[in-house]
Design a protein with these regions (language model features):
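Flexible glycine-/small-residue-rich
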Residues: 7, 33, 77-78, 134-136, ...
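Compact, glycine-rich, soluble single-domain proteins
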Residues: 19-70, 80-95, 99-111, 115-116, ...
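Residue-level signal for inorganic ion chemistry
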Residues: 45, 76, 140
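A short beta-strand-loop-alpha-helix capping motif that often carries His-Thr
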Residues: 63-80, 126-137
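Positively charged, low-complexity, intrinsically disordered RNA-binding extensions
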Residues: 93-156, 162
Length: 162
């Protein structure tokens, strides 16, 4: 599972010119599910996202989470995060999870964010052609990849989230 997490002043997503999701100060997340991803990965990713301390405290240090600042989130599905470009110039998406299963993990991730204290979690429309607008704050952009966490010997239930 891959997630590109961006600290934003605000973000919105539109389909056919109509805004379908938006957030104020907080995080905008691009979410991609891969073939080997599990519900446990979605839960861990949500826990890590909610606890990620990338907002500045009174001393200017990145020491606060989106929960700490009562921030909002916009989560957008993006299967192209799972692209493989090792061979040739055209990306292969065979590593992306099939849409029905990926949508379930996407929705689970959003629900787990709420369970982890995020009060406002809005989304795009899964599988739609979307136009995304945002003001990236910093910029601060973090990449999460649960496959790398697994390969480094970290198990989902033992990764630190503090």
């Amino acid at each position: 599972m891959k997630a590109v997490i961006q600290r934003v002043k605000n973000a919105s997503v539109a389909v056919n010119g109509e805004t379908v999701g938006k957030c104020g100060e907080g995080l905008m997340v691009l979410f991609g599910a891969e073939t080997n991803d599990t519900p446990e990965d979605a839960a861990l990713l949500a826990k890590k996202t909610a606890a990620l301390r990338i907002f500045c405290d009174e001393n200017g240090k990145m020491n606060r989470s989106v929960c700490d600042i009562n921030g909002e989130m916009l989560v957008i599905s993006q299967f192209t995060l799972c692209a493989d470009v090792k061979k040739g110039n055209r990306p292969s998406f065979t590593g992306a999870m099939e849409p029905t299963a990926a949508n379930k993990l996407y929705m689970l991730y959003c629900e787990e964010l709420r369970k982890n204290g995020i009060k406002s979690v809005e989304t795009g429309i899964f599988g739609a052609d979307m136009q995304v607008s945002l003001i990236n704050d910093g910029p601060v952009t973090i990449l999460f990849d649960t496959d790398i966490w697994r390969k480094n010997g970290n198990q989902s239930n033992t990764l630190r989230t503090d």
